[in-house]
């Protein structure tokens, strides 16, 4: 998957920090690919590797093209449902309003589709906040506290907050049935 994503050193660092940024949230959710988180962890690692696959594509077509590349790309180790899941994460990562097609609804459970949305919205939030850079993403954390999805940012980096970040935090919080909070 890393080869497909044409990962460079900057993207490798962002992938690692994306895992750290999302770990508390995703590990707290019940598994949707079996009885343990192991299969999901592997899929999420792949989704994080693919997080920037559409970065250079035209914004009007980015979601569809990136999804098709993930669905049909030359990589091994992913069965059809896994590819479909990764394709859905990628599509929603680039277009929040992407509606699952018959392909997704026939191959994935409603819980898996819901999880794909959660992962994609987490990637969207992280990318918006950090500009897809490891050094900036390290300065924030995501957690759940008292019914709130909390984005904590180091005080000296509060100026990195934008309306776009607030909006994406709100979308993710809504997906998780939580209120958004910034600290």
Where does each model-flagged region fall?
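Extended, folded domain segments that form the structural surfaces/walls around functional sites
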Residues: 34, 179-180
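Short, charged/polar low-complexity linear motifs in solvent-exposed/disordered segments
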Residues: 74-75, 150, 169
């Amino acid at each position: 998957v890393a080869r497909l994503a044409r990962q460079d050193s900057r993207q490798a660092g962002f992938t690692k920090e994306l895992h750290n940024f999302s770990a508390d949230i995703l590990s707290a959710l019940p598994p949707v690919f079996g009885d343990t988180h192991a299969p999901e962890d592997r899929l999420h690692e792949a989704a994080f590797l693919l997080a920037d696959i559409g970065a250079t594509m035209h914004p009007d077509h980015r979601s569809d093209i990136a999804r098709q590349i993930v669905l049909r790309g030359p990589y091994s180790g992913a069965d059809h449902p896994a590819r479909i899941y990764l394709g859905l994460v990628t599509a929603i990562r680039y277009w929040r309003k992407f509606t699952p097609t018959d392909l997704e609804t026939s191959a994935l459970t409603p819980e898996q589709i819901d999880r794909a949305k959660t992962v994609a919205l987490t990637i969207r939030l992280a990318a918006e906040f950090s500009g897809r850079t490891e050094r900036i993403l390290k300065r924030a954390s995501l957690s759940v506290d008292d019914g709130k999805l909390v984005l904590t940012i180091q005080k000296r980096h509060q100026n990195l907050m934008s309306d776009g970040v607030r909006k994406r935090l709100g979308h993710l919080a809504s997906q998780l049935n939580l209120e958004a909070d910034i600290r």
